[in-house]
Amino acid sequence: MKPYSDNIIFYDSEFTSLDPYKGEILSIGLIKMNGEELYLELEYDGEVSDFVKDNILPYLKGKKVSREEAREKIRKFIGGKESYLVAYVDSYDSIYWNKLFKIKDSTKNNQQPAFWMTIDFASMLFGLGINPESYNYKDKDNFYKKIGVDASKYREHNALDDAKLLREVYLKFYQSISKVMPK
């Protein structure tokens, strides 16, 4: 099995709330197939959920950039060729990506630098008969062990580390697909 395209950028974001009407993106991590990466922490001084206060904010210690700066840096990082964005579960990442790029209509794609349709890795696993929850390193049927990924070297809830982990999993997954496919 071979993916449709190798023009892929793995991404993850951390945000203030699961409520897309109130939430805003706090950080984003992107990594290309070749390993080139971009990590940004965005300016924000509004309300955040208790989970974010306890699990995200204490680790956001980098220089903060404005949303406009973030859009410019992401456009420069992606370059002129539309890439496919891959997230583990893209539900929230896509919402906050669209909010960052002020996208209200996916048919008018000129506002963002990537292909409008994000790829959801959890759905790929599900479609192949693999429990998407096994991606959680705490799961007893640990997917990582099956494909030879040491998830302990990545910080949980860090946008760049989550994107790096997804890239490593994706690459190993395609190398060892016969090991992980249900019998």
Where is each model-derived feature located?
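Two-metal-ion RNase H-like nuclease active-site motif
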Residues: 6-16
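Glycine-rich phosphate-binding "P-loop"
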Residues: 56-64
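Generic detection of long, well-ordered alpha-helical segments
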Residues: 64-71, 160-164
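Short, basic/hydrophobic alpha-helical segments
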Residues: 67-82
